[in-house]
Amino acid sequence: MTKSVKKNIKNEISIIVANLALSKNIKLDKININIQKPPKSDLGDISILIFELSKTLELPIATISEEIIKTLKSKYEIKAMGPYLNIKIPRKEYINNTIQMVNAQKDSYGTSKYLDNKKIILEFSSPNTNKPLHVGHLRNDAIGESLSRILKAVGAKITKINLINDRGVHICKSMLAYKKFGNCITPEKAFKKGDHLIGEFYVEYNKYSQENENAEKEIQDLLLKWEQKDKNTIELWEKLNKWAIEGIKETYKTTNISFDKIYLESEIFEIGKNVVLEGLEKGFCYKREDGAICIDLPSDSDEKAEAKAKQKVLIRSNGTSIYLTQDLGNIAIRTKEFNFDEMIYVVGSEQIQHFKNLFFVSEKLGISKNKQLIHLSHGMVNLIDGKMKSREGNVIDGDNLILELIESIMPEITQKIDNKENAKKNALNIALGAIHYYLLKSAVHKDIVFNKKESLSFTGNSGPYIQYVGARINSILEKYNALSIPIIKKINFELLKHEKEWEIIKIISELEENIIKAAKDLNPSILTNYSYSLAKHFSAYYQEVKVIDINNTDLTAARIEFLKTILQTIKNCMHLLNIPYMLKM
């Protein structure tokens, strides 16, 4: 497999550093060569930060820089600038190397062993069975699915988990409304997906509760019946949950979201109690006079529901558990089942304190020993007039958002595609590209306002624009193949002398480091930015350059291979972002 020029330079500098360390009797466990992009392209193609090496080797920056320059000056143009070494790489070698590497690796181009075999669990989505997925869920799903692909691309072993919340007060609200107003309606009779039908009853309960003081008591009575396994209550619960879960899974299929393991909260929620009782036996928890089992949170906790001593109830005096206790059980289950190294919870920012408390308690009870637990807190997706509230029905529904985008672009697509089914399939792929890209292009922690018009733009920083560029390149390649130009066995990449070709080659060569950075930062927006940059550079290049010239077949062949590397790189990014690649648009 072809090594990149950057890796060769890194290896060469590592040898120089190792020799310098040996001369000073310094033992190095690991040599970290920090390669960066120079602030200006005229300074060089790559930049090496010498400052950290200076501290490690206990040598002046100038001494290390001089040694590297002396050793490598016959191969590269190198200049020292303060704590940096700026290196210009010979274009011929760089272009040849990059194109050959992309052609050889194809779909695996950009992958690495940065997290080689690290076992990581990603928990995301975690919907309630009382409503359909809204656009906030779609953002959570987009982040979780994209990160699973990014982390897999850097060598991690990924397990995607979905914990479906199918029990509790919020589920009983839909059940109560259905009992009162359902009239035996079914999804089939209503011509609706099951999750949409159940969501309507959740909204109906909110209206009912505003007009009836006994609504809360009715909910508690229904919950008690569920806990006592009342036959009629359980049958109703199972029926409504089945409808909701079937509808939610249909949305997952539409949006290309998948899981390795799906848990139902109702099947595992009691396990956390055993974890807490074991903690009580070991003295990590204590029992209050009223029988509640508690633990003390750290002094910096913002928990306000407990006493001043930051006391946290894990099992109530009536024997019921809280949500945190159930999550303790989940950690115990997953440790036993998967023996993971790291578990990442993709959950909105409103749960920051919950996970802070969970991680503290799990460590104190010893159930997360040698395990890294991470809450990847993502921002909210808002309406123009503020935060979504599904209990009021004021929510951007995920399925309906997809349908709205499809309807917006269908008139344009049907002008190009006569077959209605093919047109609808294309429209769906564009809608998914628009949604996933828009939900991923902002940093994970930021709140966003979903703008439908902006998301569908074919000219701006959007999914459809990336899809369009991919389809445009494919069209050029098809046009070239149709010309039946004689195959040139040895392509001369030295003919690629246009400045924009050089700029694009450098961007293509940076895919691996961008994927690694996205994995390190748990931030897919790094790859949306990268994809947009590559697509923009191609568009500018294509406006200036004639790719197919039948009077210059050697240059045409070189440029066609060059376009293949651009397309492969874009396709690899689209896969990592869960954006459908389209041959035609």
Swiss-Prot record:
Q: Extract the SMART domains matched here.
A: Arg_tRNA_synt_N, DALR_1
Q: Which SUPFAM superfamilies match?
A: Anticodon-binding domain of a subclass of class I aminoacyl-tRNA synthetases, Arginyl-tRNA synthetase (ArgRS), N-terminal 'additional' domain, Nucleotidylyl transferase
Q: Does the keyword Membrane apply?
A: no
* Motif mapping: 'HIGH' region: 127-137
Q: Which Pfam families match?
A: Arg_tRNA_synt_N (PF03485), DALR_1 (PF05746), tRNA-synt_1d (PF00750)
Can you supply one Gene Ontology CC term for this chain's record?
Answer: cytoplasm
Localization of this protein = Cytoplasm
GO molecular function terms noted in the UniProt entry: arginine-tRNA ligase activity; ATP binding
**InterPro entries, per this entry?**
aa-tRNA-synth_I_CS, Arg-tRNA-ligase, Arg-tRNA-synth_N, Arg-tRNA-synth_N_sf, ArgRS_core, DALR_anticod-bd, Rossmann-like_a/b/a_fold, tRNAsynth_Ia_anticodon-bd
Catalysed transformations (reactions): tRNA(Arg) + L-arginine + ATP = L-arginyl-tRNA(Arg) + AMP + diphosphate
Keyword terms: Aminoacyl-tRNA synthetase, ATP-binding, Cytoplasm, Ligase, Nucleotide-binding, Protein biosynthesis
Tell me which EC number(s) this protein carries: 6.1.1.19
Tell me which Gene Ontology terms the entry assigns under biological process. Answer: arginyl-tRNA aminoacylation
Q: Which HAMAP family match?
A: Arg_tRNA_synth
The record's NCBIfam families line, in alphabetical order, gives: argS
Q: How does it assemble?
A: Monomer.
Family, similarity comment: Belongs to the class-I aminoacyl-tRNA synthetase family.
Give the protein's recorded name.
Arginine--tRNA ligase
- Record organism: Borrelia garinii subsp. bavariensis (strain ATCC BAA-2496 / DSM 23469 / PBi)
The beginning of the lineage is: Bacteria, Pseudomonadati, Spirochaetota, Spirochaetia, Spirochaetales
